[in-house]
Amino acid sequence: MDSHSSHLNAANRSRSSQTPSPSHSASASVTSSLHKRKLAATTAANAAASEDHAPPSSSFPPSSFSADTRDGALTSNDELESISARGADTDSDPDESEDIVVDDDEDEFAPEQDQDSSIRTFTAARLDSSSGVNGSSRNTKLKTESSTVKLESSDGGKDGGSSVVGTGVSGTVGGSSISGLVPKDESVKVLAENFQTSGAYIAREEALKREEQAGRLKFVCYSNDSIDEHMMCLIGLKNIFARQLPNMPKEYIVRLLMDRKHKSVMVLRGNLVVGGITYRPYHSQKFGEIAFCAITADEQVKGYGTRLMNHLKQHARDVDGLTHFLTYADNNAVGYFVKQGFTKEIYLEKDVWHGFIKDYDGGLLMECKIDPKLPYTDLSSMIRQQRKAIDERIRELSNCQNVYPKIEFLKNEAGIPRKIIKVEEIRGLREAGWTPDQWGHTRFKLFNGSADMVTNQKQLNALMRALLKTMQDHADAWPFKEPVDSRDVPDYYDIIKDPIDLKVIAKRVESEQYYVTLDMFVADARRMFNNCRTYNSPDTIYYKCATRLETHFHSKVQAGLQSGAKSQ
């Protein structure tokens, strides 16, 4: 494809040599100086690009959505600010400034003179008029208009399949003090109301859906159609990508973004671009290629990325007729794309996509299939209906919705209950299906199952007393006979949060009320040994005592179980 042609002669870089950026980008480094950009654009003019097929390999490594998507910052209007500053300091014509930014586009689309002229005319008019609005400076106005876009890594691209050239998820804080925006408290309140009952995903989706219905949020799909309003949004989005993907040459971002074969789905808050995804649909092949993606930093972790991707999926399916998305991801991006429904296995036939997307060294090709029936922009309603249906079915089979008053359960110092509460006295237990034969259920087969519960409990207490005595009489039991004194070991209880010792175990055994199963007794003994090994290093006497005593204890437990089985 022409938008992915290697028009910039940048050296290939492996992902291991790149420094991870908060923008989830793994692309080549940005040419920072104006001279380099013009030189790269001149070089691009000499490169031959195929109209329908991508070159065999790309000089840029695959860009990605990194794991720090939600924390990445992406600013906007950075490029426009520099243009404005140059215009203020020099006598250069605004057209010249625009040529600097859209150099690659002019070379690539030289036959399309109307596109070039419209971009230059639009930018010149915008730069000339921006300085007089509300008495603000040109730079301030431009910052407000092209605030950055960020994309969350929460939900993602099930839309389909082509390689990601400059995918980045993140954004800069832009325009947080702009008048006319709804206070953030309202969104927070809506999320708080729905979070407990609906879950985080549904709460965010429904909150953003309400903002859409109220007209505060708008999702649009624009391309380079020479309409001023659309071009303003695209330039704002371009600045987001440029800031979000610092290793990606700005000329390359402009080239893909302004390519008329690419489309950009954007989320707007008022007239401010908040986020966007640029992709190229291959209608004849029924798959799409995501190129860039970003959301402003101050709007992250609010569900914008999820909502944006859902709109992209629905638009790609309903308007473009796509069934898949493909994308190249680096190591930082794989986790994000998995959350968006992408898989590492490519099920789409290779003949469908091979030759249409670029191959990247070190990138992992991932695929996402677009469901033909899912209402992507109304998933929260569908999930709520499904959850309601499941709850109603559960209520038909269970009385779990009944909540009974709590019971009073007081304990002594060793955790021994002051008052014995019979299990059958616990309200709702029988209604839940409990039966008396389940009392004292244990994975250890101790005694005759035909004996009554009282007899079994007496036999259990006798076994636990015998096991306790074997531990107390063992030569390695001395570190465990008393609780650890915090005056001798000040930090012990900072490290060991659930201490236990033979003295506490003895009190619980003698009460004949605490250990109702052998499992509970064995669990306390194991915790005592594990606490010792957690605090002490392996070369200490305490660590070795714990290991030897534990071995002795387990051998006695097995012997007791075997003798009990023989007595039956």
Swiss-Prot record:
This is Histone acetyltransferase GCN5. It comes from Arabidopsis thaliana. Keywords: Activator, Acyltransferase, Bromodomain, Chromatin regulator, Nucleus, Transcription, Transcription regulation, Transferase. Acetylates histone H3 and ADA2 proteins in vitro. Acetylates 'Lys-14' of histone H3. Acetylation of histones gives a specific tag for epigenetic transcription activation. Operates in concert with certain DNA-binding transcriptional activators. Acts via the formation of large multiprotein complexes that modify the chromatin. Its EC number is 2.3.1.48. The active site is at residue 289. Expressed in roots and leaves. Residues 90-115 have a biased composition (Acidic residues). Residues 222-371 form the N-acetyltransferase domain. SUPFAM superfamilies: Acyl-CoA N-acyltransferases (Nat) (SSF55729), Bromodomain (SSF47370).
